[in-house]
Amino acid sequence: MKKTFFIADLHLSENRPHLTELFVQFMQTQALQAEKLYILGDLFDFWIGDDEQSALIETVQQQILQLSQKGIPCYFIHGNRDFLVGRHFANSCGMELLPTYQIVNLYGKKVLICHGDTLCTDDLAYQQYRKKVQQKWLQWLFLHLPLKVRLKIAEKIRQKSKTDKTHKSIEIMDVNKDFVEQIMQQFQVNILIHGHTHKQNIHQNPPHFTRIVLGDWGATASVLEVSANGFQFI
């Protein structure tokens, strides 16, 4: 039976090698059973430019490339941690970059997919930050800084993000349900798949909509399998 896999929020980094091991294991086993793989953001814990080189980046690049060479396409939507992943890296591993919101047809079902950070509209501070860092001129300026400087800036942003989370309520950092319904109506879909919140679940509100939230990776991998039979986490 044909199936499509969705993953997100792996937050791969040199500091957590077990996550890279999980990713390699997934790519060399389960991923080979899919006809398509979608990565909905935050594959990396941070990304400072396609010119950075490391053992981690090379491993990920090789795993995605090997999958695409086997005829299994891989699609990527930027997350809030790796929004600077560019075409150079994507092309090097045969991966296709998708826009913030993308409609896909999954076995007769029209589905909207996204990372999910744009759905958290109650987190005003984050949305203001996102608006700033999405400016092309600022991205261009950042990417032309020396690698060492970019690394320091990225580390400061990560630390600030951790600090900010301790002062925010769980509700503020979750999706705004009214905005979710608005987006789904705008794209004329009744199924949405996203990540970002790390709250793996399948929310069903028939006959209106189904919202599937991908989980983050920790001790185990979180993979959503979609087939003609429906949706399930494996």
UniProtKB/Swiss-Prot annotation:
SUPFAM superfamilies per the UniProt record, alphabetical: Metallo-dependent phosphatases
Molecular function via GO: manganese ion binding; UDP-2,3-diacylglucosamine hydrolase activity
Listed InterPro entries: Calcineurin-like_PHP_ApaH, LpxH-like, Metallo-depent_PP-like, UDP-diacylglucosamine_Hdrlase
Membrane topology: Peripheral membrane protein
Cofactor: Mn(2+)
Main location: membrane
Pfam families: Metallophos
Binding site for substrate: 80-81, 123, 161, 165, 168, 196
Superkingdom of origin organism: Bacteria
Localization per record: Cell inner membrane
Enzyme class: hydrolase
Co-factor: note: Binds 2 Mn(2+) ions per subunit in a binuclear metal center.
EC identifiers of the protein: 3.6.1.54
Binding site for Mn(2+) 1: 9, 11, 42, 198
One of the protein's GO biological processes: lipid A biosynthetic process
Pathway(s) it belongs to: Glycolipid biosynthesis; lipid IV(A) biosynthesis; lipid IV(A) from (3R)-3-hydroxytetradecanoyl-[acyl-carrier-protein] and UDP-N-acetyl-alpha-D-glucosamine: step 4/6
Family statement drawn from the similarity comment of this UniProt entry: Belongs to the LpxH family.
HAMAP family on file: LpxH
Protein name according to UniProt: UDP-2,3-diacylglucosamine hydrolase
Gene that encodes it: lpxH
